Structure formats: C-alpha cells, structure tokens
C-alpha cells in the first residue's frame, strides 16, 4: 500500500491536523494489535471488546499511527474520526479507485469461495491477481483485502457475503466492480 498518513487523513476527513506527517508512508493497516509491525496503521474496531483498548499495545508493537474515535496524547500520531470502520471503508474505496485495478466481485448463496478461487486462478495465468483471503467477505474483510493487495495487482477478485440486508449494496459501493 502506497499511502501517506496525511493522504489517509485527507481521504477519511480527519478531525485533527496531521500535516506534520505529510511524507510519512504507511506500510499497511491492521485491526489486530498482535499483528502490528513497524510502520503500520492500527484500526481499533468495536466488537466484543473495543479496539481502542489496544491502541497502546499497537504502538508498543510498532504502529506508526492509529485511527481513533477519541482524542489521544499529542506524542502519538493518530487520525481522529467519528467512526473508525467507516473511515476504513472510505479509505479502501479510495485506494481501489486510485490504483485503477480491475475489480471482479463474486456473491451468491453458495459456492462463493470456490468460484472466487477459480476466477482468480484463471486470471492469474495472464494477469497479476489478488483475491479475498479465506472468507474475508464482509464490511471489514473486503476493505482489509483491498488495502492489502500487492502494489502491482492488475485484477482483484473480491468475495462479497451478506449477513444483513444492505450488505451487498455497501460492499458493491465500496468496490465498484467492473
């Protein structure tokens, strides 16, 4: 992923000033503080536990910065947003457009993963391709996949699953399959 902290802040509509980090490049985005490596941007999601509880751990593990819905101390680089998940999704949509990769989407009641894998394997004979890993096919997994694709990707095959009414619409709006 080739994005600077300043560019990310601009895309997601950060509520704080990050101009001091204009040239600071982010390696990748992680929502699991245990998987953070040096130069990553941490994404604190709310689930069974609030990911904000793990911001300090993420910094200790090498995070360069974090998204946050709460003010942090001035010595920590952060992007203040109203909703971290929404910011993550907005960033993924921007990144897919910026890279101009061809997006292929697979959805349905049964056979999504097998179909996605087959399409990927066929395209990989001619193009540099990337695909949804496992079944990361929801409102978190799809943006995660998009933001983790290699920089030289020409075709990305995204699996889209639905748990709630409107999920496919959301994912299609983010990915804009062609």
PLM feature segments, named:
Residues 1-90:
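N-terminal leader/targeting and accessory segments in enzymes
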Residues 10-12, 88-178:
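Phosphate-binding loop of NTP-binding sites
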């Amino acid at each position: 992923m080739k994005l600077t902290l300043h560019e990310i802040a601009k895309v997601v509509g950060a509520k704080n000033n990050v101009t001091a980090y204009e040239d600071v490049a982010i390696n990748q985005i992680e929502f699991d503080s245990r998987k953070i490596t040096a130069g990553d941007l941490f994404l604190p999601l709310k689930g069974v536990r609030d990911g904000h509880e793990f911001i300090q751990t993420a910094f200790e593990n090498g995070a360069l910065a974090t998204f946050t819905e709460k003010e942090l101390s001035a010595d920590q680089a952060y992007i203040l947003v109203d909703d971290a998940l929404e910011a993550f999704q907005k960033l993924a949509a921007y990144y897919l457009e910026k890279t101009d990769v061809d997006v292929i989407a697979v959805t349905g009641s049964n056979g999504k993963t097998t179909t996605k894998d087959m399409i990927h394997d066929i395209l990989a004979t001619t193009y540099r391709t990337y695909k949804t890993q496992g079944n990361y096919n929801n409102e978190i997994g799809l943006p995660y996949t998009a933001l983790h694709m290699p920089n030289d990707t020409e075709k990305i095959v995204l699996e889209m699953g639905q748990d709630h009414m409107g999920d496919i619409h959301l994912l299609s709006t983010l990915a804009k399959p062609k």
